[in-house]
Amino acid sequence: ELKKISVPQPGELMPGDPLPDLIIWPESPAPFFENDVRLHQTLSSIAQESHAYVLAGTLGVARGSEAGQVYNSAQLVAPNGDWVARYDKIHLVPFGEYVPLENFFALLHMKKLVREVGNFVPGTERMVLPVHSYKLGTFICYESSYPDEVREFAANGAQLLVNISNDGWFGDSPAPWQHLRMAR
């Protein structure tokens, strides 16, 4: 039974307190690809030591014929340290995670104006992730602004909805508050 899904502050847990079943890290907590050995070992160790699932934002890497493509992803690590599932963000942020009309900008020789923009590939499936006997619907940041899309997770069987985001990189600006209003 999922009872506590927040991260305790230092000194908050007392001996005998129940440990969390799920540890949630934000979108892009570290600039590592999912296949980076350090990230893989760190997340697996946290899951094993805490006996909890870990959900963390990662840079997902495509495999097979799609190799070389990168996704903004949420990775689920099981309590035994195995990486069991990954959700790839579908609704990317224009001019933040991809350049709309990229070929148009190239024709106008304006590509250098947008070269700092991420070049993510959108995911294709709003899959639910298995956490114990629950099904978790995880959407990433900006996707929370589209309620019909979020509802698709519930339609796919999600019993718990989690939005991982890292609005902290906007600093002391109106952006995090704007995101909150859009998500309501």
Residue spans for each PLM region:
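Enzyme catalytic cores with a strong preference for nitrogen-chemistry domains
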Residues: 1-184
